[in-house]
C-alpha cells in the first residue's frame, strides 16, 4: 500500500527542496527518518491500570505496540526506584511513520480546540521537530467513552535536515500547519 505522503515527497517535495536549497544530489534532500511518540506516566508506579490503558491507546493510535520505558535512576523525591515503569514509547519508521504523520496532519491537529497552527519554533537546531499534545481525544481512533483519564503525549519528528530552516521547509511542504508568526 503506497502512502500518500511518501508519493508526495518523492514526486513534488524533492524537486522543490532541491531547487530551493540548491542541492546537487537527490540524497542531500532532507527526509523523514522516524517519528517517536512518547507518553510519560508519573502515576504508573502506583497505578498499573494507567499503564495498561496507555499501552492500549498508543497501539490504537500508532498501529504498533509501545515499549515500556523504565527509570534509569532512583529518585526519592518522585518516589521511583531504578527499573520502575515510568512511561510508554513507540518509534515509527517507513510505512507506519508516513501513515501516522498523514493522520496527524490531516485529521488529528485540526481537531484541537482553538487550533491556529503549531509553533514553528519547536525545532532543536538540527532540523528535528517536537510537539506536545495535551489530550489523546484529537485522534479519531480513540473512543471518548473508553478512556479513563485525559493524558497527553510528546511527538518527535526526526529528519535528516542539517538546519532548522531545511526541516521547517520539509515539514511545511508535507502539509504541517505552522502558525504564522
Swiss-Prot record:
Alphabetized Pfam families for the sequence: Ribosomal_L5, Ribosomal_L5_C
HAMAP family registered for this protein in UniProt: Ribosomal_uL5_B
Source species: Picosynechococcus sp. (strain ATCC 27264 / PCC 7002 / PR-6)
Protein name (record): Large ribosomal subunit protein uL5
Name of the gene this protein is made from: rplE
Family annotation (PANTHER family): 60S RIBOSOMAL PROTEIN L11-RELATED (PTHR11994)
Ribosomal protein in keyword set: yes
Chain's role: This is one of the proteins that bind and probably mediate the attachment of the 5S RNA into the large ribosomal subunit, where it forms part of the central protuberance. In the 70S ribosome it contacts protein S13 of the 30S subunit (bridge B1b), connecting the 2 subunits; this bridge is implicated in subunit movement. Contacts the P site tRNA; the 5S rRNA and some of its associated proteins might help stabilize positioning of ribosome-bound tRNAs.
Assembly and interaction partners: Part of the 50S ribosomal subunit; part of the 5S rRNA/L5/L18/L25 subcomplex. Contacts the 5S rRNA and the P site tRNA. Forms a bridge to the 30S subunit in the 70S ribosome.
Amino acid at each position: 500500500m503506497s502512502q500518500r505522503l511518501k508519493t508526495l515527497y518523492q514526486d513534488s517535495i524533492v524537486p522543490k527542496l532541491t531547487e530551493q536549497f540548491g542541492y546537487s544530489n537527490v540524497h542531500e534532500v532532507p527526509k523523514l527518518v522516524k517519528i517517536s511518540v512518547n507518553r510519560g506516566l508519573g502515576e504508573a508506579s502506583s497505578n498499573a491500570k494507567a499503564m495498561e490503558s496507555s499501552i492500549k491507546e498508543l497501539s490504537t493510535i500508532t498501529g504498533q505496540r509501545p515499549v515500556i520505558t523504565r527509570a534509569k535512576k532512583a529518585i526519592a523525591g518522585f518516589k521511583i526506584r531504578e527499573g520502575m515503569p515510568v512511561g510508554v514509547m513507540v518509534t515509527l519508521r517507513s510505512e507506519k511513520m508516513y501513515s501516522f504523520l498523514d493522520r496527524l496532519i490531516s485529521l488529528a491537529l485540526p481537531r484541537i480546540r482553538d487550533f491556529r497552527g503549531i509553533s514553528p519554533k519547536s525545532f532543536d537546531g538540527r532540523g528535528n521537530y517536537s510537539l506536545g499534545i495535551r489530550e489523546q481525544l484529537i485522534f479519531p481512533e480513540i473512543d471518548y467513552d473508553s478512556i479513563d483519564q485525559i493524558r497527553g503525549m510528546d511527538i518527535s519528528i526526526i529528519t535528516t535536515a542539517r538546519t532548522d530552516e531545511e526541516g521547517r521547509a520539509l515539514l511545511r511542504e508535507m502539509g504541517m500547519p505552522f502558525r504564522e508568526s
